A protein has these predicted regions:
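Flexible "cap/lid" loop of the alpha/beta hydrolase fold
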Residues: 15-52
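Short loop/helix-cap segments at secondary-structure boundaries that form the rim of catalytic
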Residues: 13-15, 102-104, 116-125
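Catalytic active-site module of serine/aspartate enzymes centered on a nucleophile-bearing elbow/loop
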Residues: 127-155
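Conserved small/polar residues in nucleotide/adenosyl-binding loops
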Residues: 1-5
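Hydrolases whose catalytic domains are alpha/beta-hydrolase-1, hotdog thioesterase
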Residues: 7-12
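Conserved beta-strand scaffold positions in the cores of enzyme catalytic domains, especially
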Residues: 21, 107-109, 124-128
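Conserved alpha/beta-hydrolase catalytic His-Asp/Glu region
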Residues: 53-99
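Short beta-strand/loop motif that positions the catalytic acidic residue
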Residues: 109-111, 115
Length: 155
């Protein structure tokens, strides 16, 4: 699952039994959050972030970082288009207050080595995707087409 959905599927797996759960570009426990997210969690700073800034932020990132970032933002907008403010506030609160202290032993974690949202320095036990970014599920489709079937079928 992708980003927040990785957290959601791990919570679902506590209710519905699975042989394995695969997460992509996500985290396995709250201890894998980068330091700035951990600080935001402890101070509740995320609550002062107006969720309607998300659209403005995407435009800003595209302007500052150029065509590649703009292309990633367009993909993000296409695949993450549900932007109801109440949902976004709930999602941020749920994300920052996730209480998973230890990774679940059946979670398989696939993560890009260039992910700037969840840098690999904070992660333990994951399958690295060389040069993969946080949006690698879109841009590294060849890697996923070649490797995901093996990961799924492997015992």
């Amino acid at each position: 699952m992708y980003k927040r959905q990785g957290i959601i599927v791990q919570e679902i797996s506590k209710i519905i039994s699975f042989k394995k759960v695969i997460i992509i570009s996500s985290v396995k426990s709250m201890h894998e959050y980068p330091i700035h997210m951990q600080i935001s969690r402890k101070t509740k700073a995320y609550k002062i972030f107006p969720v309607n800034w998300i659209d403005d932020f995407e435009a800003f990132v595209g302007f500052i970082f150029g065509p590649l970032a703009r292309k990633q933002m367009e993909h993000s907008r296409k695949y993450l288009s549900y932007r109801d403010p109440f949902y976004l506030e709930w999602a941020l609160d749920a994300f920052f207050n996730w209480k998973q202290k230890k990774p679940l032993n059946y979670v398989i974690h696939i993560h890009g080595t260039y992910d700037m949202v969840f840098p690999i320095i904070y992660l333990k036990e994951f399958i690295p995707v060389k040069s993969g970014t946080h949006a690698m599920i879109i841009f590294k489709k060849k890697w996923f087409n070649e490797n995901l079937p093996k990961i799924i079928m492997d015992d």
